[in-house]
């Protein structure tokens, strides 16, 4: 593991320099201030940037709070032992949005979770991702939150940056959350470089014992990006929807990096995935990642059209091994509540839950009243 200070190159990108005991967070300048653009390299360095691909030689990376003197004691990423996601990352806090309380009840998220937010267009996924990021910075200050935006609209990138900046700084004066983004006015190589550098930085932070949460929007656009690359979509075989047979190999490795480790830290990835876009390729991308996640939260367009938010489809949403994240007594009550709700239409389920959230100030009161 090597770390380094960064300097601005003539092309506006960041180039890595020699080791330094004081490394900066992703998107920060050596002075400590957040830079408005994520770190990226020029086209030559893109060919050698560290990422999930097995053939890329390592480059010095910026790891917040890492002392290079401890590098010989750190266990490499490939040798870390993966374990089940836990403990739970609690979303509920005083005055939190309803979405946070419903996630805690029906789709709990733990450290190391590989979570999919499955959503049709205009169902509220972006708002949900920002609510989750705010809740994590509020309740879990030990976690570093990174927003990874690929091929997003420039105004969405600005909105994310301002929202994340409003979360404030931690006790050390570093931002609680940063954004690494490549908007849709940039090219494919820029998208790939940003996503691969982000996940490489996260891996080094986990090796150093940090807990990292990546909020990604979206896996669908990431898959599209790699499908447009001559380097990564090079098998010569085309699947349904125009996807190259090798196009999703690296995106699978990126999403699969999320894990809790026994010897070091954890990497949690909460990524949105688009469905019902009218594109066969987008559906293929969703099916490819569906089996890789261990938590799935599905948003319903019909519920959103009734202006009911969060528009969660409870019957299709859930977390694997949720018994590790929810106390046994609460789990029995939540299971009974879920069974009762399954007898109602999806929009009625949300109406009933929102009414219950208004009656009870906390989830503890709600679950206790149902026991």
Protein language model regions, located:
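Arginine-glycine-rich low-complexity intrinsically disordered regions
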Residues: 1-59
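Extended, compositionally biased low-complexity polar/Lys-Gly-rich tracts
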Residues: 48-72, 77-80, 174-191
């Amino acid at each position: 593991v090597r770390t380094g200070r960064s300097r601005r190159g003539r092309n506006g990108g960041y180039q890595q320099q020699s080791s330094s005991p004081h490394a900066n967070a992703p998107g920060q300048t050596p002075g400590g201030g957040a830079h408005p653009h994520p770190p990226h390299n020029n086209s030559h360095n893109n060919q050698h940037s560290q990422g999930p691909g097995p053939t890329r030689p390592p480059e010095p990376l910026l790891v917040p709070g890492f002392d290079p003197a401890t590098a010989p004691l750190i266990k490499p990423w490939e040798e870390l032992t993966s374990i089940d996601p836990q403990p739970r990352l609690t979303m509920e806090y005083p005055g939190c949005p309803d979405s946070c309380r419903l996630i805690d009840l029906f789709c709990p998220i733990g450290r190391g979770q590989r979570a999919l937010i499955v959503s049709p267009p205009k169902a509220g996924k972006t708002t949900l991702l920002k609510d989750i990021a705010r809740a994590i910075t509020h309740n879990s200050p030990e976690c570093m939150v990174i927003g990874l935006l690929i091929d997003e609209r420039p105004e969405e990138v600005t909105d994310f940056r301002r929202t994340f900046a409003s979360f404030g700084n931690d006790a050390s004066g570093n931002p609680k959350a940063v954004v690494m983004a490549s908007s849709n006015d940039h090219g494919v190589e820029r998208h790939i470089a940003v996503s691969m550098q982000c996940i490489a930085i996260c891996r080094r932070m986990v090796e150093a014992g940090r807990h990292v949460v990546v909020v990604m929007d979206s896996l669908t656009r990431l898959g599209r990006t790699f499908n447009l690359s001559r380097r990564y979509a090079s098998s010569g075989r085309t699947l349904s929807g125009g996807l190259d047979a090798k196009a999703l190999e690296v995106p699978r490795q990126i999403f699969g990096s999320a894990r809790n480790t026994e010897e070091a830290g954890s990497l949690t990835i909460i990524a949105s995935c688009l469905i019902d876009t009218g594109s066969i390729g987008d559906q293929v991308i969703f099916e490819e990642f569906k089996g890789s996640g261990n938590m799935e939260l599905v948003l319903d367009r019909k519920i959103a059209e009734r202006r009911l938010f969060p528009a969660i489809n409870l019957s299709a949403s859930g977390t694997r091994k949720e018994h590790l994240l929810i106390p046994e007594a609460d789990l029995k009550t939540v299971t009974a509540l879920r069974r009762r709700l399954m007898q109602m239409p999806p929009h009625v389920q949300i109406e009933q839950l929102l009414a219950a959230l208004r009656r009870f100030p906390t989830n503890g009161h709600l679950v206790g009243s149902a026991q």
